[in-house]
Each structure stands twice: as C-alpha cells, then as structure tokens.
C-alpha cells in the first residue's frame, strides 16, 4: 500500500514539474538581453498582457496581442521571423510561446521576468 502512495506522489510531482516548464525548445532571455534586440527587423515583439495592462505601461517596440485572443490573431505574425514574447511576470508569455509553437512557429523566445524585470 505504501508503494502505491509513493507512485502517486511521484506522478503528481512529475505533472507539477511539467506544467511549470515554459516549454520544450523555447528560448529564454533576460530583459537586459532584450534591449540589444530592438531595431532588429528579423524580430517580432508581442506583449500578451491585457489591453488595460498594456495601456498602463508597455515597451514601445511591442505590439499588444493578449493571450486570450492569441490563437485568433497568430496569423498576423510571420513564421519566418523570431517572435519575442513578454507579459507581466513571464508566465503568460511562456504559455503564449507554447501556443505559438503548437501553431507552427518555430522560433519563439520568452522574456524571463517580464515587465516586472524591465527597466528603461
């Protein structure tokens, strides 16, 4: 009986870790690394926060494409350019990267720490 409990616990830990991972083959960059990418025409910058969050404070290089409507608007993005994704903390942007990967975008990058880590 104790063995079954250990197995169940191991499965729960595995599922938790898998849910917390930002995704396979998703590059992570810091906000300091992000600054060096501005002006690069081979990059697309999207902010997946809500419109209200975006209006309150955003980085001028980023286009607002809220996570909840990302699947409907992903066709506006080029699959030939890298997509840099940001949110408030890095969690929604990690989810957005997974969504984009599933839709066939091969080069997506998550900004670690999101706007919480940003400073001009």
Feature annotation, model-predicted:
Residues 44, 61-63, 107-109:
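Conserved beta-strand segments of alpha/beta enzyme cores
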Residues 48-50, 67, 113:
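Active-site loop/turn elements of alpha/beta-hydrolase fold enzymes
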Residues 57, 119-120:
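Short Asp/Glu-rich motifs
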Residues 71, 77-119:
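Catalytic cysteine-centered active loop of the rhodanese-like fold, especially the PTP/DSP P-loop
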Residues 27, 63, 89:
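Charged, low-complexity surface patches
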Residues 1-44, 48-56:
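Flexible, polar/low-complexity N-terminal or interdomain linker segments that lie immediately upstream
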Residues 29, 65, 111:
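Hydrophobic residues at beta-strand termini and immediately following loops
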Residues 52-84:
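Extracytoplasmic/periplasmic/luminal assembly and interaction segments
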């Amino acid at each position: 009986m104790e063995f079954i409990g250990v197995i169940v616990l191991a499965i729960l830990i595995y599922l938790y870790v898998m849910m917390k991972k930002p995704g396979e083959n998703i590059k992570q960059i810091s906000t300091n690394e992000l600054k060096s990418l501005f002006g690069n025409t081979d990059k697309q910058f999207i902010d997946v926060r809500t419109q209200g969050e975006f209006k309150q404070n955003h980085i001028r290089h980023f286009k607002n494409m809220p996570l909840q409507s990302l699947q409907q608007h992903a066709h506006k993005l080029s699959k030939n350019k890298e997509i840099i994704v940001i949110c408030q903390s890095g969690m929604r942007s990690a989810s957005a990267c997974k969504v984009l990967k599933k839709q066939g975008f091969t080069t997506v990058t998550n900004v670690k720490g999101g706007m919480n880590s940003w400073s001009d």
